[in-house]
């Protein structure tokens, strides 16, 4: 588990180091302005896998940076239920939504179009999952 987290952190750092080379502009927001939501996949926040790790990381970061954080568990294991959880998070004021796992591929495509002002973070989702 620790190796997986370290790999994710390193991959993120590498991606950020390339941003200036490709003309990506930096956008800064005050952490206190962020209202972070996490939606679980078919598991819960005690699954000892992506949901739990993501929940713990989001909670710790939010506490350290003074951001509001909530998590949502879909009522069922379906794209519709995951979409409904994202809709609820946005209705509750979330402007950053974390969706851990490939099960969120369809949700990311649909919801990011519906909510262009919301930032979506999708650990363990690749372009191949979305296509």
Enumerate the predicted regions with their spans:
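A residue-level marker of the well-folded mature domains of exported/periplasmic proteins
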Residues: 27-131
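Short, low-complexity disordered leader/linker segments with a strong preference
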Residues: 1-34
């Amino acid at each position: 588990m620790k190796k997986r987290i370290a790999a994710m952190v390193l991959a993120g750092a590498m991606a950020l180091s390339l941003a200036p080379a490709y003309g990506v502009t930096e956008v800064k927001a005050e952490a206190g302005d962020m209202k972070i939501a996490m939606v679980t996949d078919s598991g819960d926040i005690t699954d000892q896998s992506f949901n739990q790790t993501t929940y713990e990381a989001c909670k710790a970061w939010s506490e350290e940076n003074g951001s509001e954080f909530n998590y949502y568990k879909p009522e069922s294991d379906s794209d519709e239920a995951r979409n409904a959880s994202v809709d609820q998070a946005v209705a509750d004021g979330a402007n950053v939504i974390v969706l851990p796992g490939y099960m969120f591929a369809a949700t990311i495509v649909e919801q990011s179009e519906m909510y262009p002002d919301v930032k979506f973070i999708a650990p363990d989702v690749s372009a191949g999952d979305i296509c």
